[in-house]
Amino acid sequence: MILAAGFGTRLFPLTIDRTKPAIPFLGKPLVGYVAEYVAKYGFTEVVVNLHHQPDSVIEALGDGSNFGVRIDYALEEPNILGTAGALDNAKHLLQDEPFLIVNGKIITDINIGALVEAHRLSGALATMVLKPNVKREKFTIVNTKDGCVTGFGPHAKPFTEEEIRDTTGSLESPLMFTGIHILDPRVFEYIPPGIFSDIVTDIYRPALTNGEKIAAHVADGNWFELSTIPRYLDISLAMMNDRDVWLGENCSISPASSVRDSVIWDDVVVADDVNLYRTIIADGVRIEAGEHYENAAIVRADMVRNCTEIPEKALKGYIQGENYIVPLN
């Protein structure tokens, strides 16, 4: 199952007209990479949950055939149900055998080829794929012992100045959850039907208290989570293979302008004497002659004007002419 129902509030305004997994990432919808990833390891029957802007996910994935999978959609109405409630909503599609869950907002090459068999042999309620949080980003710490999850801590804290100066190489990286896990159908015994519930807070924590085994699979490999605009830009630039600009379809960029380290979506027009550096330019935006932007995301202003509510977690922006500008620093 691919989780694709979230609001994407921290990616606003890029998610005004689509859910987070449906945003384009280097020429393909983000959730398309996830579909191809699970197909690579033989998971070809896929359930995708929907809530916010559901049509954007359906448009991105279709029936799944372009990505090597066959998709059943599970719509959550009228309310979003969370990472555990989503499973209950799709129980009729998942309850017959152990199933894989992958967050729809990640890019990864973690090898999960042997994970299903390892899970079967473990007898665990679930097997969580974990990864060292080398940069100590703001993810929940997962505590483990002897290959099992023992509990969940607070968010990891950034390195202190003293730790940064440490040259002994003795600093430990806490483990974090990658959003990839395999669950036994017994998990449905723990999920309250029909209401919002979170898989870690409402299911895994009580299950551990009840003596259930949750296996920990610590993985190598690349893993990127694109839940904020700065992270989306940084990861895009890192994966562009030395390209200076990612250009979408039907774009017109004046040769008299400078565009560097930027991600340009579809139908964008850049007039003369424009300077863009580290920018994300969304669909249909026109950058007028002489404008200069650095470290910014830009969408059409009319999209924001027609938006009933700007999410509290969204970065603050401002309207300039026909565009809505969101500074990223």
PLM region descriptions:
Residues 22, 73-74, 152, 216:
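Generic preference for hydrophobic
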Residues 1-58:
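N-terminal glycine-rich phosphate-binding loop and ensuing alpha1 helix
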Residues 3, 25, 49, 76, ...:
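Generic beta-sheet signal
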Residues 241, 245-329:
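Structural signal for interior beta-strand "rungs" in well-ordered beta-sheet cores
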Residues 57-146:
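Conserved beta-loop-beta/alpha segment of the NTase-like Rossmann-fold superfamily
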Residues 20, 76-81, 220-225:
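Glycine-rich "substrate-gating" loop/helix at the edge of Rossmann-like oxidoreductase active sites
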Residues 98-102, 107, 113-120, 131-136, ...:
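Catalytic-core segments of class I nucleotidyltransferases/pyrophosphorylases
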